Design a protein with these regions (language model features):
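Intrinsic disorder/low-complexity segments
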Residues: 1-40
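Anion-binding (especially nucleotide phosphate/pyrophosphate-binding) glycine-rich loop
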Residues: 38-159, 169
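Phosphate/pyrophosphate- and phosphate-bearing ligand-binding catalytic cores of soluble enzymes
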Residues: 46-47, 97, 184-305, 309-329
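Beta-strand secondary-structure signal
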Residues: 66, 127, 180-182, 215-217
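A generic local secondary-structure boundary/capping motif
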Residues: 97, 138-141, 149-153, 166-173, ...
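Short polybasic amphipathic segments
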Residues: 116-118, 179-183
Length: 329
């Protein structure tokens, strides 16, 4: 693979878009990529790409580089030839993410249409691309009489993100339906990982740092399409009634501590409706933070930290962020 300096816009081939947030690296102070050479892929490589339009909060800085590979082979070749010191982060639908205002160093990878397919397999399985949405996965399962995947309808994200964080809702979790997943590791090599290698716990896995999920296989149980649709409708109605779905939000902000509901702790601490700048704790569901207009990511994150402080002061419980926070302040 050829290399190009960052001074030029290394963009060739067809543009693709979208993967789950498979690993979110911690902010690092690294040498600007401009000082190094980047591989020239077949896909689209964009410098200083605004990320705010790609995330649900509609706030935050730019990606030093945004890479949209044409296929898994393109991603593998690019990562294999990329300087190992360059940070790599995967971006899905951007629903569980605060991109800090200083932007994200290194390369942000976004998987597109080539990674968004969902096909039925044998024995009540589905073969899903890492960029496929939860709605597409659950709808395809319904169409083929595969029950047990309805809960994915309620998670705003992509397969890669579900696999990385053991996504779950309404009594279901990815660990209960995952057969295995195909990942491209940071060095460009590939691996197939089963659930035993991911060591799933609540909203967490041990997916290797820098790994990107390009495909996954889910297995359900026999069901009638009408019954599956009824359950999906029930879930959809419940979300509509209880969550601020039409707001600029990142989804559930804090993990539920053992034996507690995060929203109840937030409410008891008097944080419902609390604001900092343009950021607000939702009145409808107080485990959701909102961008009410032109909030900065700094304001949104500061509001979350203030909520954590107040909850700790009142209940002694330290809330853990469920939303990922990436990039430089």
């Amino acid at each position: 693979m050829n290399r190009a300096g960052l001074g030029a816009c290394a963009s060739t081939g067809s543009a693709r878009a979208d993967v789950g947030s498979d690993h979110i690296p911690k902010p690092t102070q690294t040498e600007p990529v401009e000082a190094r050479a980047l591989p020239v892929p077949h896909g689209k490589l964009t410098p200083n790409a605004p990320l705010a339009p790609l995330v649900w909060f509609k706030s935050g800085g730019t990606a030093e580089w945004l890479f949209e590979p044409t296929d898994a082979a393109d991603l593998q070749a690019f990562l294999a030839d990329l300087d190992p010191s360059v940070p790599v982060m995967a971006l899905g639908l951007g629903s569980n993410l605060i991109v800090r205002d200083g932007g994200v160093p290194g390369v942000v990878v976004r998987l597109g249409k080539a990674f968004a397919k969902v096909l039925p397999g044998a024995d009540l399985t589905l073969d899903c691309g890492g960029g496929a949405s939860g709605i597409l996965v659950s709808s395809t399962a319904r169409d083929h009489g595969i029950a047990g995947l309805e809960f994915l309808r309620s998670i705003p994200g992509t397969v890669g993100g579900f696999v990385r964080m053991n996504g779950g809702a309404y009594g279901g979790e990815v660990k209960d339906i995952l057969v295995d997943c195909d990942v491209v590791l940071r060095d460009g090599s590939s691996a197939q990982l089963g659930t035993s290698l991911l060591n799933y716990t609540y909203r967490h896995s041990t997916l290797p740092e820098g790994a990107i999920v390009v495909a996954a296989r889910f297995k359900g149980r026999p069901g009638k399409s009408a019954d599956i649709q009824a359950e999906m409708d029930r879930i959809s109605s419940s979300r509509e009634a209880s969550q601020p779905l039409r707001s600029k939000t990142g989804g559930s902000t804090f993990k539920n501590p053992d034996g507690h509901k995060a929203w109840q702790l937030v409410d008891a601490a008097g944080c419902r409706g609390l604001t900092i700048g343009g950021a607000q704790v939702s009145e409808k569901h107080c485990n959701f933070l909102l961008n009410t207009g032109a909030a900065t990511s700094a304001e949104i994150e500061a509001l979350g930290e203030e909520v954590r402080r107040r909850v700790k002061a009142r209940s002694g419980i330290e809330l853990e962020w469920e939303i990922q926070r990436v990039g430089n302040q």
